[in-house]
């Protein structure tokens, strides 16, 4: 970890759950369950939570719901964890408004995804991220996920954005460990693994931590993995990484939203079903997920 990475770890955390958004039976936002889930995840070892990200079904929630959710989670965890707000959309002006609203509510940082659907050029990406970073004083993470946004943030664009004082890191979900390692060395930006299957490799490359989906179900194990790696016990870190691999396999079948909501229900935490176009797991999928969770020792 670089000096900047250590600072970002203190400001934003090292084990962050990309938290689901709980919904009631009628599909409305369930802030009471969100508060309970947030406390549960912190109790299990998370020192950060991301709300209204991909796994939080951000495309299906209104700005008002995003702020209600942020407020509920901030009130629930207090000073026990950092709360990062997803503020990225495919519209720069909208992203700026949302970032300002999240900052006013007390978010500790922002996660801003690459604008999706419109496929902007790299020059447009640089201008977009710069404009959002200019809008508040909060530390901001770039969210690089071309599998969903169609366009990657190219290494030279990330290097250029690294000069902005509010842009402090990257959530990488494109599996480019080689470029990530070079960018960390060149810029001091903190990197977070955005792909649970690559958590340990990212640590080996110098990443600060994880923004994790499987932490919904295995936060304790991931905290142990981070602790083992940090103390130089690589054998234990590898053992834990292998142990949670069935959850990554399940996520590849179900997707992060369906996996997390079904898995939490199996663990006794009902966060409701996804909003369309995401869907709840079928009975057959739940049976297969339960087997994977037992294999990962997160379900009895």
Swiss-Prot record:
GO terms for molecular function: 4-hydroxy-tetrahydrodipicolinate synthase activity. It holds the Pfam family DHDPS. SUPFAM superfamilies: Aldolase (SSF51569). Is insensitive to feedback inhibition by (S)-lysine. The keyword Nucleotide-binding does not apply. PROSITE patterns: DHDPS_1, DHDPS_2. Pyruvate binds at residues 55, 211. It comes from the Bacteria. SMART domains: DHDPS. Signal peptide: none annotated. GO terms for biological process: diaminopimelate biosynthetic process; lysine biosynthetic process via diaminopimelate. The keyword Cytoplasm applies. It is found in: Cytoplasm. NCBIfam families: dapA. Catalyzes the condensation of (S)-aspartate-beta-semialdehyde [(S)-ASA] and pyruvate to 4-hydroxy-tetrahydrodipicolinate (HTPA). Was identified as a high-confidence drug target. Homotetramer. This is 4-hydroxy-tetrahydrodipicolinate synthase. The lineage of its organism: Bacteria, Bacillati, Actinomycetota, Actinomycetes, Mycobacteriales. The gene is dapA.
């Amino acid at each position: 970890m670089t000096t900047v990475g250590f600072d970002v770890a203190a400001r934003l955390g090292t084990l962050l759950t990309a938290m689901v958004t709980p919904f009631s039976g009628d599909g409305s936002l369930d802030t009471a369950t969100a508060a309970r889930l947030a406390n549960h995840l912190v109790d299990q070892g998370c020192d950060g939570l991301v709300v209204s990200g991909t796994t939080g079904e951000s495309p299906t929630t209104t700005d008002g719901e995003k702020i209600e959710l942020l407020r509920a989670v901030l009130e629930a965890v207090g000073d026990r964890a950092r709360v990062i707000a997803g503020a990225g959309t495919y519209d720069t002006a909208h992203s700026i408004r949302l970032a300002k609203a999240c900052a006013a509510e007390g978010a500790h940082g922002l996660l801003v995804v690459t604008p999706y659907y419109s496929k902007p050029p790299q020059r447009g990406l640089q201008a977009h991220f710069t404009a959002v970073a200019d809008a508040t004083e909060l530390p901001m993470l770039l969210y690089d996920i071309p599998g969903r946004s169609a366009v990657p943030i190219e290494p030279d664009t990330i290097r250029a954005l690294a000069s902005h004082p509010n842009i402090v890191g990257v959530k990488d979900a494109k599996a480019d460990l080689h470029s990530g390692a070079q960018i960390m060395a060149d810029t001091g930006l903190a990197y977070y693994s955005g792909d649970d299957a690559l958590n340990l490799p990212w640590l080996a490359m110098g990443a600060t931590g994880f923004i994790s989906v499987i932490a919904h179900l295995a936060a304790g194990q991931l905290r142990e993995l981070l602790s083992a790696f940090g103390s130089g016990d690589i054998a234990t870190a590898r053992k834990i990484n292998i142990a949670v691999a069935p959850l990554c396999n399940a996520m590849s079948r179900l997707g992060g939203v369906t996996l997390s909501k079904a898995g939490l229900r199996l663990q006794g935490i009902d966060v409701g079903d996804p909003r369309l176009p995401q869907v709840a797991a079928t009975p057959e999928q739940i049976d297969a997920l339960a087997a994977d969770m037992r294999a990962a020792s997160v379900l009895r």
